[in-house]
């Protein structure tokens, strides 16, 4: 073992050993407990960023910890390789998405290896290869045959200038990002998978996910959005078909003063035919894409259609308005509006002078006031005829029963969740395996003709998808008849919804090998960002249930435990140019002066300009405050970067990047190295003889075993990796000061260092590998996690604090099993205590075993 710690040399050597010996390549072993650890796979954007490093370090720490617990650990990696950024980069760099993607994969793969992550590289795949998406295509055709896939028209963002569909992120302030043309909403046929068929199960099974953060489960519950309500009909004057509305508040029915319909509702289209003003308003609403989250805050606009509806119970005639806050995608595209008891309806009614009819008053008898805002609480009905005096649930049931009896409504369960639209009008995605014959019939591509391969040698013009532009690509046959291929591609969430399962049998000649899949699944630990709570994590749960119902897997859920790591933040600096726009300056190009509390007082860039400090914010390209992991690894070594990542903050909280913290982690590793070197260079040590230890030696050994117990619990159960590292650091401080003279001193240090090296191994595997060999052991990758000795934790002696009238006056060292009488006698005879009791009468003595003797005297 060299005296100086040289991370670059060590890491290169150890990584080569892992590659050569295929340390992390695994197969099914029925005799061993399995552990499947997975971090969300990366999009091959070109370079790893610190967010990746944090995510993958956490996954690797869990994997290596479980490995030393003796489990059969699988930790795979791959590439989420389809998607829009590749198309944009291809246009910008005058290339095709495929070569750009494959080059990035090679570069990033090398970066992952330099960080020392223990992946089974034999399981690696990229989702953009036909070997992967072929099975997705086949599974989709099976779902179609089961009636779980259908096609319907749905709105998309349309650029009339480029004549192309835009993704949401390509719409900037309502305009096309390329040509600045106002974007329109256009209806086109698209493919959907019936996730709504599984809505109730997806909701119910959240209760079984005990290893998931409560916040993620709440987000999914809200996204699925189960509600119990009433679906009821309003007859429309002059129309045959009634207006169907859904409400969760039938108790407010008698307060309805208008009906609101979405701009896309058939009635709105009909009413606007002979009303140019209404037609223009409908068009404006349709081309204003509204996110559901914005509904509460946006300006409420509407227009009277001239149509009237008839209240189903009291016969009141109410106007029908087109309203911009009613969305066609949710419910029936029509709402019954009760301004007195719904704030959105209230704002709209106030603006357009529509009646506000209160019908609910507070249960506590306080005065009802709707002069400034709606009263939205549940309460007691009044001015509601036969329903007066009823509370919410009674009114709900009674009104629903009456509507049902009259054939005008029924109780129903509604979900906010919509079917999954999987069509994308983009090129760089898996082709949807459907064809249309000349008679207009749609058919799935037969299994023996799969995969439908996406051509990779294409020219991107930045506007039209190459497979849409090349008419010959779509031309094919079906049962000998001419047919046209679907030129839309799958939503890239399709690939990431089942990749975790493909890792179990990446070479299988089917979507999965059930035997292998059921050995490994479900994933024991999944690590990724909380931003995926509602899309990726929900789609994966759905896909898992589809795979189960198709007979491939036996489990109900894909991921047992979920850890959502926090974001990585860094200081951000900017300079305002003459135009008043912010130029973001990289933190590495800024010199800062700090005050006594470490706050930045002044910042100057490398051109000598004073720059503004914007605070600690998420690392991003747009703010130019990303720190390149490569530079940090080159400077300090992978182990240091990994250790800092795990120590600087709890895994699920934001992490503030501070290079001073990285330097601190590096100094700590040097200290450990130095102590191991000093100890090992003296030759082999004896084993600990517990019966021959002095009091101080026993105390140190107790600290060692307490640390093992704490670190084991912190990493294994609590996943508070930062406190585990803090405990190891604390122990190292004690070991550095401990005597190393006697045989038993060296024996204890040897036991301690062997424990420390194994406890550090998950975080810092390269240095641990070297130190383990220096300590006379063979291979730390196949070592056993240290176990704490229960006997070592037992204390022979206790320190008892003596308090006199609430103030600390003495400390006693007593036998661990000392009785109250013995402690009392020692306490009252302690020289210091006697001083403070002189001349006082003892009134009360309180004894807390093993801790405290409290004396009250006056």
UniProtKB/Swiss-Prot annotation:
A motif ('KMSKS' region) lies at residues 618-622. GO terms for biological process: leucyl-tRNA aminoacylation. ATP binds at residue 621. Coiled coil: none annotated. It is an enzyme of class 6 (ligase). GO terms for molecular function: aminoacyl-tRNA deacylase activity; ATP binding; leucine-tRNA ligase activity. Keywords: Aminoacyl-tRNA synthetase, ATP-binding, Cytoplasm, Ligase, Nucleotide-binding, Protein biosynthesis. It catalyses: tRNA(Leu) + L-leucine + ATP = L-leucyl-tRNA(Leu) + AMP + diphosphate. It is found in: Cytoplasm. The keyword Cytoplasm applies. A motif ('HIGH' region) lies at residues 42-52. PROSITE patterns: AA_TRNA_LIGASE_I. GO terms for cellular component: cytosol. Its EC number is 6.1.1.4. Belongs to the class-I aminoacyl-tRNA synthetase family. NCBIfam families: leuS_bact. This is Leucine--tRNA ligase. It comes from Vibrio atlanticus (strain LGP32).
